[in-house]
């Protein structure tokens, strides 16, 4: 059934249909003679619906015919999507021909019911020391990478994808939501060079896209991940960046004429976040482990967008500018980062005690910093001097060369097993390496490499 455009305001388009054939909310409409797809957001009465454009509205004019597809936007799913880059509509944008999918699924679906959901306490080893030690990931859990501009969220995410694809040979889905096109391009070539592209499906809705596109692209990626999960696989879903999803929602909300709430965000912020996050879950057939980069505006974690995201996560990895300034990468704050899995019943006594020991030493060092700044190191007791020395070694040992950063650093990347991570940090806490210079611990993998580096420095 067709209607016609009656009003265009930016990305918002009003379409009039016969009263007995008004489209449902979330139905996809196609503007005739163009490739433009619209998604119905509101029914205004008198047969008029308000829709958001999924692409540019240039060249559209009043009176153009619009055809109702009668269903929501549907996208290709399954193995055909691996190694391909798609847009929000599931169309290929990598110039490698058709996707050739066997099946398509609508992007709007209900979250799995309570009966279908399954919880798991199995740990997912990432090979990144600071994450495995202080904020371990659960298989089928949700992780947030929080950080301001330029502290390394995307690089950390790329390293996680590389490590998990190489070491665990699982499928991953990457949804680029409102990020830089350059990063998307770098990411694609990085995956190609690491030979893991055939295990990753990529869905991009970058910064230059209209808000409707950026609001829905996360759902497109999630739908592809859900299909892998329903086929009995353990899949990883990477979203970069969840803040841009919220931001796109804010833009759409304003365009639809809703009254803004705190800090200008949409009044439906919590609900929109919930709709996405509740679908990212594990069922009895398979699991979705999700890693989401969360941009923190002005480094303020109390901003409504990151604050709303917090409540949905099992683990939070906080990237701190103060650590990046010291030249320690990954710039993860071991005192601010948390995980539900860091529990002696889940990770075991040894891991738990080592992690808490590391945090205790770093916390004490943080408290002593003021005294050192005013009075100097000489005024500290011998015990405190030892604590400071160990803390500085731990701080440097938390750094690690990344595979995806080899191009910038020139240092080969390192994957460190959980067993080696615990052994190294426990050794520093026990004082086994008190005689080594702290510089030996900087940018190495295992503790044995630190010892070797110290010997070479002599």
Curated annotation (Swiss-Prot):
Which catalysed reactions does the entry list for this protein? Answer: ATP + H2O + 4 H(+)(in) = ADP + phosphate + 5 H(+)(out)
**Could you tell me where this protein is found in the cell?**
Cell inner membrane
The way it spans or sits in the membrane comes to: Peripheral membrane protein
Per the UniProt record, which EC number(s) apply here?
Answer: 7.1.2.2
* Residues reported in the UniProt entry to bind ATP: 147-154
Keywords noted in UniProt: ATP synthesis, ATP-binding, Cell inner membrane, Cell membrane, CF(1), Hydrogen ion transport, Ion transport, Membrane, Nucleotide-binding, Translocase, Transport
Bilayer-crossing regions: none
Entry's Gene Ontology molecular function annotations: ATP binding; ATP hydrolysis activity; proton-transporting ATP synthase activity, rotational mechanism
Xref: InterPro entries: AAA+_ATPase, ATP-synt_VA_C, ATP_synth_F1_bsu, ATPase_a/bsu_AS, ATPase_alpha/beta_chains, ATPase_F1/V1/A1_a/bsu_N, ATPase_F1/V1/A1_a/bsu_N_sf, ATPase_F1/V1/A1_a/bsu_nucl-bd
Name a GO CC annotation attached to this entry.
Answer: plasma membrane
PROSITE patterns attached to this UniProt entry: ATPASE_ALPHA_BETA
Q: What does this protein do?
A: Produces ATP from ADP in the presence of a proton gradient across the membrane. The catalytic sites are hosted primarily by the beta subunits.
Q: Which family does it belong to?
A: Belongs to the ATPase alpha/beta chains family.
Its assembly, as annotated, is: F-type ATPases have 2 components, CF(1) - the catalytic core - and CF(0) - the membrane proton channel. CF(1) has five subunits: alpha(3), beta(3), gamma(1), delta(1), epsilon(1). CF(0) has three main subunits: a(1), b(2) and c(9-12). The alpha and beta chains form an alternating ring which encloses part of the gamma chain. CF(1) is attached to CF(0) by a central stalk formed by the gamma and epsilon chains, while a peripheral stalk is formed by the delta and b chains.
Q: Which PANTHER family match?
A: ATP SYNTHASE, ATP SYNTHASE SUBUNIT BETA, MITOCHONDRIAL
Instruction: Cite the NCBIfam families for this sequence.
Output: atpD (TIGR01039)
Please give the name of this protein.
ATP synthase subunit beta
